[in-house]
């Protein structure tokens, strides 16, 4: 497993370098980044994060450290800048475990920020049983990494957006949203410094928080004949749902969309405002959205494995999130 893990990581880093070296001299549009999102790469990302070497990615474990290193190495390979005091942002979980968020900045031309996040932790290995967490939430991290790479590719081609994109892989979600609250504390206390501008990122500088949490499953369908669906939870007034509707007109996307959690006001409120990583941002008035394909019967089970995900549909969801961001930046 070690050899396969290292080979797959090497291949992903090599593909990132190759993408950065593409020829110029053509009209730049967001569509130029579509080829970065491939089913093969997404599958490799999920397989790496669900490998036995990552051991289920429970906070404070060697498997979590390996997952952090994997994410950090890819952030670095994409050219995402690290804060002066480091890419790994340490904190303690509710159970006292050492945990770390992993961050990377893609500089924009202006002074505002958009946070794009996905939690990488899961429940680990219990009583000798590995809980891989493919959908929850290796799929979200794979989406995060792919979106980061897509925007980096556009920047290499000469396209820069006004807000700086702050990509964050969050730890400790399964323990009281620890990583999300730690990220907010660092922002509120001025401890997260923009490595390019050289000044702290403050809450008032943030335009939006986008959270990606479980986007690989197809079992919790909106309509039984449409496995290709996506749920976006947001406040109606600030979520920019129109941006997702426009993104969905692309033939490469064309998903079955919903803006609530299966028609339930109560479940929509719980998942949007209480139990997901956008909570501390919402609590402080930052417009936030959550992308998900919903909870399935595999959640928190050993059967949540990489082969159970639909990577063609995951790719389309990644494109939807990417084009949503393009519209709101």
Regions found by a protein language model. Name each.
Residues 111, 170-276, 288:
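Metal-dependent peptidase/peptidase-like ectodomains
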Residues 23-66, 78, 82, 293, ...:
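N-terminal capping segment at the start of a domain
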Residues 7-16:
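Bacterial N-terminal signal peptides
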Residues 56-106:
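A non-catalytic alpha/beta surface segment that caps or lines the substrate-entry region
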Residues 28-36, 52-62, 90-93, 101, ...:
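Second-shell loop/turn segments in exported
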Residues 292-329:
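His/Asp/Glu-rich mid-to-C-terminal helical/loop segments that flank catalytic regions of hydrolases
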Residues 104, 116-117, 121-177, 321:
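Alpha-helical metal-binding/catalytic segments enriched in His/Glu/Asp
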Residues 49, 75, 92-127:
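Acidic/His- and Gly-rich active-site-bordering loop/insert found
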